[in-house]
Amino acid sequence: MTDLSKKVRAWGRRLLVGTAAAVTLPGLIGLAGGAPTAGAFSRPGLPVEYLQVPSAGMGRNIKVQFQSGGNNSPAVYLLDGLRAQDDYNGWDINTPAFEWYYQSGLSIIMPVGGQSSFYSDWYSPACGKAGCTTYKWETFLTSELPQYLQSNKSVKPTGSAAVGISMAGSSALILAAYHPQQFIYAGSLSALMDPSQGMGPSLIGLAMGDAGGYKASDMWGPSSDPAWQRNDPTIQIPKLVGNNTRLWVYCGNGTPSELGGANMPAEFLENFVRSSNLKFQDAYNAAGGHNAVFHFDQNGTHSWEYWGAQLNAMKPDLQGTLGATPGGGG
């Protein structure tokens, strides 16, 4: 085979993969709000509160689901996927997370809303199918919300964790990169770890258009804008290593197991994001990182069954890293 033939075949494969992704990803990245699991919602009777937290940055109150871990307890912020709803956080809809972390000594914080937001401060109003609103989620999560929780719920404003799925997995890492005193722990589950690279901006734009009719350019500008690299976890590895942030990074390979998630969209998307996670691990190790747990299982699809299992598995690590005192909060 000639060099030219090899190049043609290589470009053909790339075009095929890119076309498949472009056709399939709208609604797939949003599968991070996918099918509910059998264990959806925690049992009634837990001390879960529904807070209305004022946000000057967003010009409205933001609903936050909250379960106390006791006075001066560290916080775990559980961040939702691209199709975040306005009634409940996806972690509550799809898992019994409040049950799992009851009396863990960790305060569980679930912000509600933020569809397609990447939990970022957007350049422009977030205009979609439901109209326009202001997205200043990074400001809310790193300033307004921790101040409110400290003043009203006796939650530590520092030494916290951010754990996110899909869209919010990269967000959790970025929050920790730029706010290291608040977030000493970041968990990323099935995220695209290099959103600024290659077709990332285009595919994210397609997915956001499908999940609410939003535009990626309203968020971070054109793909050439520095905001894309600023919000790229792989590019920000030096900050994470320098901060000595504790990381928990998970990604399956698109093969379902007995946990479930056996459907084409969930299988395709998990396989699609896996390579960016492997590259992230390589870059992290090359940068001298030594404070991370990587789980790249030989099964797992882009669905809540696997993310819930990871949240359960990381509980002792969260408690140890954040210095929780089990038994608090009820």
UniProtKB/Swiss-Prot annotation:
Disulfide bonds join 127-132. Its EC number is 2.3.1.122, 2.3.1.20. It catalyses: 2 alpha,alpha'-trehalose 6-mycolate = alpha,alpha'-trehalose 6,6'-bismycolate + alpha,alpha-trehalose; an acyl-CoA + a 1,2-diacyl-sn-glycerol = a triacyl-sn-glycerol + CoA. Keywords: Acyltransferase, Disulfide bond, Secreted, Signal, Transferase. GO terms for cellular component: extracellular region. Belongs to the mycobacterial A85 antigen family. It is an enzyme of class 2 (transferase). Pfam families: Esterase. This is Diacylglycerol acyltransferase/mycolyltransferase Ag85B. The antigen 85 proteins (FbpA, FbpB, FbpC) are responsible for the high affinity of mycobacteria for fibronectin, a large adhesive glycoprotein, which facilitates the attachment of M.tuberculosis to murine alveolar macrophages (AMs). They also help to maintain the integrity of the cell wall by catalyzing the transfer of mycolic acids to cell wall arabinogalactan and through the synthesis of alpha,alpha-trehalose dimycolate (TDM, cord factor). GO terms for molecular function: diacylglycerol O-acyltransferase activity; trehalose O-mycolyltransferase activity. InterPro entries: AB_hydrolase_fold, Esterase-like, Mycobacterial_A85_antigen, TAT_signal. Its main location: secreted. PANTHER family: DIACYLGLYCEROL ACYLTRANSFERASE_MYCOLYLTRANSFERASE AG85A (PTHR48098:SF1), ENTEROCHELIN ESTERASE-RELATED (PTHR48098). It comes from the Bacteria. The active site is at residues 166, 270, 302. Residues 98-108 are annotated as: Fibronectin-binding. Residues 1-40 form the signal peptide. It is found in: Secreted. Substrate binds at residues 82-83, 166, 194, 272-275, 279, 302-304.
